[in-house]
Amino acid sequence: NERDENYQGSNTQIDSERTSGNYHIFYPQGKYIDMINKRLATLTLKRKIRSDAILMNSFVIGSDGEFFKGMRAWEQRAFFEDCARFFMDKYGYENMLSAVVHVDETTPHMHLNFVPINDGRLSSKSLFDRQKLAELQTELWEQVGKKYGLKRGKENSQATHITAAEHKAKVIVQSAEQKRDEIDRQTEQK
């Protein structure tokens, strides 16, 4: 998720005038595939890596807009640095590929990319099943979130993921409904 002022993507939430404010907690040291291969070469693997193996995990770390509202830039940076440090401590600095903070979208957030090494082997599956992801969220909240006054999200929530397109459509519908209601109120007042 690297981009500069000349980035031409399809995400309409990006404000290109704010893209120059994006920053790295740590930069990628080359192309991701080269960095991954270099890291894997340091391992003593017992088996060949499967062709369908997950070579990189990516997390998006952030909170809702209300959390960042009124927060100074240095406070936001401290929050994201603390989050990155948490992941480095948990999964190993040597496995980290990059951490970039985007401030050019609706809500600031960090993209963190790393090689999923567990017990000296490439294994995203053993690191990130449903239970371990829930535990990860709790640990992150306990070690970082509490410090910033965040509340732990609902555990075992039955909420389902919707696509970005579905979310955008929902926001457009809600906005149109609000405008309609406002017009109705103004019409009733006349």
Residue ranges and their predicted role:
Residues N1-K190:
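N-terminal nicking endonuclease/strand-transfer module with a His-rich metal-binding environment
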